[in-house]
Amino acid sequence: MHFLDDNIQIKIDKFYKKNSLNKNRVIVAFSGGADSTTLLLNLKYYLSNNIVAFYFAHFIRTDNEQNKEIEHVKGFCDLYNIALQVKKCDIDIKSESVRLGVSIEELARKCRYNALENALKENDANYIALAHNENDQIETIIMRFFQGSFLDGLSGIPGVNKNIIRPLLEVSRLEIENFLSLNNISFFVDSTNAQDLYLRNRVRNNLLPSIEKIFKGYQKCLKRISEFSKEFVDYFEKDEFFPVEKGKYYYSFDLKTFLNFPKYLVFRLIFKILNSEGIVAKVSYKALNEAFKVEINRKKNNVLLKTNDFFLEKRHNKINLIFKRDEKFYKPFDFILEVGKWHSLSLGKILLKCLECNTSSVSRLKCCSYEFRYKFFKDRFKAKKFFSKFIRCNPIYLMLLALDNRLIGIIDLNTLNLVWSEKSILKKISISLIGGLLKE
């Protein structure tokens, strides 16, 4: 295949070499539109047809238009001898987005990416290629700027993100249009592109023309901001500037360091931790900023931020980021551990067994969570004083052992350590703990 314009081929080759990518099989996200058509044909040539076109039908538009687009995609791939997979969305995105309280764009994107990941595995491919171009990059930076994004957002769309590649990020929309026109290549036009239904369309159709009138050549300036932002982000990514204590299901920060460190770096660290734990959380700057209003000398412990996936709490001289892996674990538990019988704590996969008792007076051992701590003290003040010894332990993971309503031991389920015991009694009892707070 020979093109009348090889400028895009040159840029794709430069992209591959710059990012040290191999030329193994690629899944190309193909919609039939101008951008993905240009990407598909150029990668077919560059990778010697070691590609699979993947089309995802959202069925957000009318069935008639969607089916016409599918017909075009199939005919196009037949014409150019390109392997094609077509996947139809198995949920109603419009109604489901309302039920979940997310935008149609967001849910459609999630469904499409999930389908692409499955196609990657099915076809034993190395990369998923998306057709974002230079203009998409500009639009993204502007949207993120007005949405109050951090430097990470102003870095723009990454050219390579794990197994996702975007070879056209240095190619302008004008170059794409010229390529298709010169080579007389047909493409499908999505009717929603000209409508202001979605945020990106409104930015593209209404905002950018106004900016262009006032700031000629603004694209170069935004590109420079993006490059500088990326340099900062890469620099902070390399080094850990913030001391963090890591547990199985939590991260802990020193309170004073947390409050005195630049907010940007603290916010970045929190989002980085959430991302590493597979939590995609939308937390507003306003909500996070509230966490910095906590008083250092205030003795009261309190929750600073709470979501469905995690919560941020102040506890003594620490700020703890704790994940809600299983709601069952955070509900109080209170049970009897009988001699010779196993008992399982569901979340942590902890198995407990009272193996033997050297006294007839001990036959059943009571196990309960930290919430029951006041049951063992008549005086609430004495209880607080006693448990203040264990401020280094996260109370969520403390299991209390009691006999005849008397506290005889405390186990930290996070470390499986006996942190305190009434030795005169506990030495008569043998307890086995198997497992640990293992990630699912």
Swiss-Prot record:
SUPFAM superfamilies tied to this protein: Adenine nucleotide alpha hydrolases-like (SSF52402)
Reactions the enzyme catalyzes: cytidine(34) in tRNA(Ile2) + L-lysine + ATP = lysidine(34) in tRNA(Ile2) + AMP + diphosphate + H(+)
EC number: 6.3.4.19
Record Pfam families: ATP_bind_3 (PF01171)
Gene3D superfamilies: HUPs (3.40.50.620)
Biological process annotations from GO: tRNA modification
GO MF annotation terms: ATP binding; tRNA(Ile)-lysidine synthase activity
Residues annotated for ATP binding in this entry: 31-36
Keywords per UniProt: ATP-binding, Cytoplasm, Ligase, Nucleotide-binding, tRNA processing
Family: Belongs to the tRNA(Ile)-lysidine synthase family.
Domain notes: The N-terminal region contains the highly conserved SGGXDS motif, predicted to be a P-loop motif involved in ATP binding.
Record NCBIfam families: lysidine_TilS_N
Name of this protein: tRNA(Ile)-lysidine synthase
Protein's organism: Borrelia garinii subsp. bavariensis (strain ATCC BAA-2496 / DSM 23469 / PBi) (Borreliella bavariensis)
Source species taxonomy: Bacteria, Pseudomonadati, Spirochaetota, Spirochaetia, Spirochaetales
